[in-house]
């Protein structure tokens, strides 16, 4: 937010200067241009975070497409137990996918934005992605819950739920984004409240209108534990790697400053220091990329081990996924 704060301060100074000089109209135009630049910068950072936020929801298409025919087929055979089992498997698979993605975006929001969008202001874009990461869990779970309700014949209920959630989103954006202390951060907060409300209503409806309702504790507990531990591992690895990279950068800068003390004129000294600073900057960018990718890779391994160790998934669950049988054989389920 440093650049944006400077722009706002410049707008205030321009307005004050215009008032003292009598050029209020010119100052107002300058303030308008500066504020428009700030708003575009804010929306640009938010749009970049949205691009990453939308990726996990696209993975839900395969699950939602398989839930409706599987549940409808079981109900047509009057197999209510089978329909309930398929519904529970769909929710469990979704939780196993959505929880780690949401936790990963929440924990690694800033380094991911720095890796993919280095030109953006990471102090602004990072927290936006982290907040949107929490909304990812609610969106993915809501999509599958809607499919379950539709498979049981309750076609209109998901629409009503979405209308209620949309009202919450509009209310939050209108009132919270306008708060100076919240600003653009109110937009992802609106996503959390909107889709969190939709998911809560969907789960209540599933429990009320569907026979043999799924046991939510059995479905969500193990994915939540595995995701929480995975997030802790990613946070620890990235934190340790960042400290190592900062130590190396500090040593490189000290070496550059030491070389600048040698005789050779002021120009040579400044040149040596400039080369050292560029070396530190390159090391920072490369180090962030390596540390971020390494933390994500270790998090994936930790999560996979925990899912198998906790028995968080079964062969019936994998049957809803593409190549589920091969994955089950690989995991020896």
Provide a role label for each language-model segment.
Residues 211, 238-333:
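Membrane-proximal transmembrane or re-entrant/amphipathic helices at the cytosolic face
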Residues 61-64, 127-153, 157-177, 184-207, ...:
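Short runs within selected transmembrane alpha-helices of multi-pass transporters and secretion channels
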Residues 86-107, 184-209, 224, 301:
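Short alpha-helical transmembrane segments in multi-pass integral membrane proteins
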Residues 52, 92-100, 134-138, 225-233:
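Hydrophobic alpha-helical transmembrane segments of multipass membrane transporters and ion channels
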Residues 1, 192-243, 301-319:
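C-terminal transmembrane helix end/exit motif
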Residues 49, 60-79, 84-87, 91, ...:
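Helix-loop junctions and terminal segments of transmembrane helices
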Residues 30-32, 42-60, 91-96:
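Alpha-helical transmembrane segments of polytopic membrane transporters and translocases
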Residues 10-13, 32-44, 105-139, 250-251:
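Interfacial segments at transmembrane-helix termini and the short loops linking adjacent helices
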């Amino acid at each position: 937010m440093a650049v944006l704060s400077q722009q706002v301060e410049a707008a205030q100074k321009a307005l004050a200067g215009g008032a003292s000089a009598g050029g209020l109209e010119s100052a107002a135009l300058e303030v308008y241009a500066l504020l428009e630049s700030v708003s575009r910068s804010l929306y640009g950072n938010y749009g970049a975070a949205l691009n990453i936020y939308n990726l996990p929801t696209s993975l839900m298409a395969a699950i939602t497409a398989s839930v409706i025919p599987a549940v409808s087929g079981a109900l047509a055979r009057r197999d209510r137990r089978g329909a309930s089992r398929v519904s529970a498997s769909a929710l469990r698979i979704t939780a196993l996918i959505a929880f780690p993605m949401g936790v990963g975006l929440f924990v690694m929001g800033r380094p991911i934005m720095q890796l993919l969008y280095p030109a953006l202001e990471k102090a602004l874009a990072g927290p936006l992605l982290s907040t949107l990461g929490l909304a990812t869990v609610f969106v993915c779970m809501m999509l599958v819950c809607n499919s379950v309700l539709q498979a049981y014949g309750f076609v209109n209920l998901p629409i009503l739920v979405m209308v209620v959630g949309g009202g919450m989103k509009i209310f939050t954006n209108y009132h919270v984004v306008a708060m100076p202390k919240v600003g653009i951060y109110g937009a992802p907060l609106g996503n959390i409240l909107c889709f969190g409300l939709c998911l809560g209503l969907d789960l209540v409806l599933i429990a009320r209108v569907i026979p043999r309702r799924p046991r939510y504790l059995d479905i969500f507990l193990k994915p939540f534990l595995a995701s929480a531990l995975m997030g802790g591992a990613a946070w620890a690895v990235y934190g340790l790697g960042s400290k190592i990279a900062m130590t190396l950068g500090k040593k490189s800068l000290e070496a550059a400053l030491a070389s600048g003390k040698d005789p050779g004129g002021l120009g040579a000294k400044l040149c040596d220091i400039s080369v050292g600073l560029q070396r530190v900057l390159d090391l920072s960018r490369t180090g962030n990329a390596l540390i971020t990718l390494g933390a994500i890779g270790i998090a994936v391994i930790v999560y996979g081990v925990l899912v198998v160790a906790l028995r968080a998934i079964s062969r019936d669950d994998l049957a809803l996924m593409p190549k589920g049988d091969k994955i089950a054989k690989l995991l020896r389920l």
